[in-house]
Amino acid sequence: MATSILGEEPRFGTTPLAMLAATCNKIGNTSPLTTLPDSSAFSKGGFHPWKRSSSSCNLGSSLPGFTVATSRSTSGLTTTTGAGNSAFCLASTSPTSSAFSAEYSSLFSNTTSVSSQDSGQSAFISKVHSSADTLYPRVGMAHPYESWYKSGFHSTISGDVANGASTWWDVHTNPGSWLEVQNPAGTLQSSLHSGTPQAIHSQLSGYNPDFSSLTHSAFSSTGISPTASHLLSTSQHLLTQEGFKTVIPTYTDASATNAMISGASSGIGTSSRSSRRYSGRATCDCPNCQEAERLGPAGASLRRKGLHSCHIPGCGKVYGKTSHLKAHLRWHTGERPFVCNWLFCGKRFTRSDELQRHLRTHTGEKRFACPVCNKRFMRSDHLSKHIKTHTAGGGGKKGSDSDTDTSNLETPRSESPELILEGVNPRVTVKDQSPHHES
């Protein structure tokens, strides 16, 4: 306590308990140990605000890496600190430092000397300072790339943002580049709203001569206004960067390739047409068509007949159309692609005309009428059969009536008409044929 009254601090050790005791003695003491130049304004307690004393604070000066030394008048957030100014500095009136400050000042002075000699340490500290310089003026920004589009449109951003050190995203430092990101005068806005696309022409000439005439040739024929064409050419120019140069010319190359392919295909087509004279006709795999294809020009007579035979052994049926032959082949394969959509029916047929005939049984339509007796029939073969009864005489009229009745009740099946007639009423068919034999 005697040393405290005389104004000298005891020489404490480095133990935490001794440091805590010294701090408590300072706080509880009302003697003018920590007298400040304006200590008359603070008369309470012995607790004084942290301020720099007349003597230099070694603690603040020994921490160069933790002080943010930024002095910018244009920035909204300025932090001006002196060479030794720090919030951690202790007030002291004695010109000579106390034991506490002396020990730590020697410690931090050694650190400062070592850090000044170490190049890696100084590089790290300078990096911290530069990051702090680029960080604090951008406190108001919400996006890391706002300097791209706010440099020319907003005046609240300080000028050092646009004129400061170039960061990693400032890749277009050339004033003649297509996007003026470092010009605070707003050249981006003026270039986007210019009336004529001459600037784009001058910029396109630096990339590739193939794109120099795109804006005039593409928009002069369509009648687009110069402003609209300029905006479109701007977006078109954005695609002409180095990464897209190999993509855009593929349209012209594709047209040339299509021309080459069409030429090659036309050559192949002419060769095939020379071997096959009737190229417009649908291809057929029947034996007659294959024989005519094998004979070449000598098989012109077979092609002229237009006969298509069934290739199934033992059948030998011949049709004049390929569609009829295909429908006939469904009889052999059992394929029935035509389905009745009537409620709860679902029957399937091999031919479309059979499906239409079957639908008449649901609707009750009788399309075919006899010109003699005015009777109506659902099927044309039933009508022709009925007409034979009129021409044969009165003997077959009774049978024709019975045939008409059965035709109204009969539902068509997926069988040939000959089998249907024989299966429904073989007696009538015999009577119908007997007058012909007699005559």
From Swiss-Prot:
Residues 384-439 are annotated as: Disordered. InterPro entries: Znf_C2H2_sf (IPR036236), Znf_C2H2_type (IPR013087). GO terms for biological process: embryonic limb morphogenesis; embryonic pectoral fin morphogenesis; positive regulation of fibroblast growth factor receptor signaling pathway; regulation of transcription by RNA polymerase II. Its main location: nucleus. A motif (9aaTAD) lies at residues 166-174. Residues 429-439 have a biased composition (Basic and acidic residues). GO terms for cellular component: nucleus. A zinc finger (C2H2-type) spans 308-332, 338-362, 368-390. It is found in: Nucleus. It comes from the Eukaryota. GO terms for molecular function: DNA-binding transcription factor activity, RNA polymerase II-specific; RNA polymerase II cis-regulatory region sequence-specific DNA binding; zinc ion binding. Gene3D superfamilies: Classic Zinc Finger (3.30.160.60). Pfam families: zf-C2H2. Keywords: DNA-binding, Metal-binding, Nucleus, Repeat, Transcription, Transcription regulation, Zinc, Zinc-finger. The 9aaTAD motif is a transactivation domain present in a large number of yeast and animal transcription factors. In SP9, the motif is inactive. Transcription factor which plays a key role in limb development. Positively regulates FGF8 expression in the apical ectodermal ridge (AER) and contributes to limb outgrowth in embryos. PANTHER family: KRUEPPEL-LIKE TRANSCRIPTION FACTOR, TRANSCRIPTION FACTOR SP9. Belongs to the Sp1 C2H2-type zinc-finger protein family. This is Transcription factor Sp9. It comes from Danio rerio (Zebrafish).
